């Protein structure tokens, strides 16, 4: 069971960084990976209001925010054209669309789960 004592919706990345300096703090995303274990969280830091849920294409790169849902990777036409569909294939077998709408890129990478096709794809892309 996940137990949260204090909830803070960060107003800036700087505030989130400062709050996250304590070991008892935890950054929240889609929360699907956090639910996998028992944990007591003193301060939960919500990043959902910081605009980190987008995929932006520049001349040099694709910029993918940490709060971007996995389903957005699956459906982003330009990103999938660039990777010849590899991004779409790396996420399409992850549970279901509802789950992929909640699970985030940041949580999938930060969790370093051995079963993570997302992490493997980003490693293969040398990101």
Where are the regions a protein language model picked out?
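C-terminal structural segment of proteins
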Residues: 1-127
């Amino acid at each position: 069971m996940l137990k949260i004592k204090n909830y803070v919706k960060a107003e800036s990345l700087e505030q989130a960084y400062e709050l996250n300096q304590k070991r008892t703090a935890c950054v929240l995303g889609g929360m699907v990976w956090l639910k996998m274990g028992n944990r007591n969280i003193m301060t939960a830091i919500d990043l959902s209001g910081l605009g980190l849920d987008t995929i932006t294409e520049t001349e040099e790169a694709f910029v993918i925010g940490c709060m971007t849902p996995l389903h957005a990777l699956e459906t982003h036409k330009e990103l999938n054209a660039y990777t010849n569909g590899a991004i779409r294939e790396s996420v399409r077998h992850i549970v279901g669309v509802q789950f992929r709408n909640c699970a985030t890129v940041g949580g999938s990478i930060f969790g370093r789960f051995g079963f993570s096709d997302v992490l493997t794809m980003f490693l293969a892309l040398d990101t």
